[in-house]
Amino acid sequence: MPNISSRAYSTADADNLAATGLHPVLARIYAARGIQDMRQLEHELSALLPFPAMKNAEEMARRLADAIGASKRLLVIADYDSDGATACAVAIRALREFGATVDYLVPNRFEYGYGLTPEIVRLAVHVGCNKRSALHHVEQHTAQCASLIDALRDLPIDRSGKPDILITVDNGISSVAGVEEANRLGMQVLVTDHHLPGDFLPDAACIVNPSQPGCGFPSKNLAGVGVIFYVMLALRAELRSRGTYATKPEPNLAKLLDLVALGTVADVVKLDDNNRILVHQGLKRIRAGRACPGINAILKVAGRKAEKASTYDLGFVVGPRLNAAGRLDDMALGIECLLADSEERAFTMAQQLDALNRERREIEADMLASAETATQDSARSAIRQMESNTSEGATLFRPTDCFSLCLYDPDWHQGVIGILASRLKDKTHRPVIAFARSNNGELKGSGRSIRGLHLRDALDLVAKRKPYLLQKFGGHAFAAGLTIQECHFEEFTATFEEIAQSLLTPADLERIIECDGSLEIPAMNLNLAKALTEQVWGQGFPQPAFQETFVVKSQRVVGEKHLRLKLGKAGQIFDGILFFHNEPLPDWINAVYRLDVNEYNGSQSLQLMIEYWEEASEG
């Protein structure tokens, strides 16, 4: 059973916030999230951190301005997730408005893997700025070779149409070999990324990454889309200084904030003060009907209203449908949807994304069932081994005895292992790495971690302890990707477990549900629920939840799998909803809940959305 913990907060900070006229409950909530000054809650664009604070942003802007002035050919190299797709769309839309000759290329994860690899660089030479005909030529040559990689190695280099500059978005900081290949072939590389750098930086012409050594940018939490947005701000300022807009209006980069908000939320980066401004402004545009046709279309096919859009819609509605393209097919579909200017074209592609997402859910459900069966079989096997083992000191292995989980099934889908790792991490409250089979005896792994184990740093320890185990890896504190040889799976699993045990304590493995304490009855009202919906909540700035003991006055199943509740507290009755649970509740429950605005037939009412419950004694 998880432990329920109330978030600590500074009473002095809460009192100072309340003294400005802020509701005392809101003051307490914000203080628990590190807010000390009301200025931290400002969402105006004028409060954004200035781009000159970003190392190399102005230098990259000068290089891009020179390239545009010289009619150089630019090619954006994107990542195949939502952050990469939105970053690509921001780069393409902005650069075209600035007058650049630009196209994009996104690696297919199943053929090329992640990032600016040497193979992608060689493909970029053939793609140039005539993508369709070049790709057709490569595909024809591939049919004569054993693999696509062999085809790219063997294909003669035609430098006549190659790009002059490659611009990476949401990748590139670890692409040492890829940048080296680009340099050899006479292409400049401009890296924009937000992932943590390794021991060696690529020899790129310019790198913009808030996490790179020597960058004093105060916010280290920008997503890849946020980084390229800052570069575009710097580029506009550079073009302005050159007199480009002396006789014509400047491009309005604020119209790209819907894309910035989507990528920021979908990539689950921390919503610090700066990111909350970006997300707030993006949501404001979406709600006002000024989003790009692609985002509107995805919301529409999902049955969501743009005017009511929230961070939930970005993270759990639009993001997964966009990601489905990169997981199961080709992220070019998602990028084209975001670049579409026609509502009809955007809607057609949004329907395709929705279909891919439904397929992804089915695959995910099968993989999750397979993973749970595998862990149960391991436990049963260990029990049988213990029962038949008479030697002193025999121990029973269960997944719960481990500090980490590494799982592999040859039938698992490479594009869905990240979601699988996330689901298993939530279930077991342990770092989880799920592997799927790739090519040439390789396994692709995707990991998710918990507080207390920085996943990228843990993988770095594996690499330093046993360099032959990891072919490549990268990521963040809570998510990372890696490649190993299948023959090394068992040894990697054991080594990663050793490192997990050295970094984590048993207390770290206990699931903790954080909430914001109890609410007084007068505060449990519709006005407070509405006030809470006006803030941007997400990773690192969690949506408020509260804890109370209720008597269950009535309960009924709705929609076959949810419970509609009447909950009593101190003589008051509150409407409640418990999703994905249709078994009867006990008479008394201890519940963690959120204040929610329920809209029905044009009217609004307070609803308690139950996040967690356990049986309680009478309150």
What is the meaning of each model-derived region?
Residues 465-470, 498-505:
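A common structural junction motif
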Residues 488-492, 588-619:
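OB-fold single-stranded nucleic acid-binding module
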Residues 474, 532, 551, 586-599:
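OB-fold and OB-like beta-barrel modules that bind single-stranded nucleic acids
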Residues 568-584:
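Beta-strand/loop nucleic-acid-binding surfaces
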Residues 539-559, 591:
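Structural detector for short beta-strands of small beta-barrel domains
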Residues 555-560, 578-583, 596-607:
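Single-stranded nucleic-acid-binding OB-fold domains
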Residues 124-127, 166-269:
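Conserved phosphate-handling catalytic cores of large alpha/beta enzymes
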Residues 2, 7-132, 136-140, 144-165, ...:
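Hydrophobic helix-and-loop "lid/oligomerization" segment in the mid-to-C-terminal part
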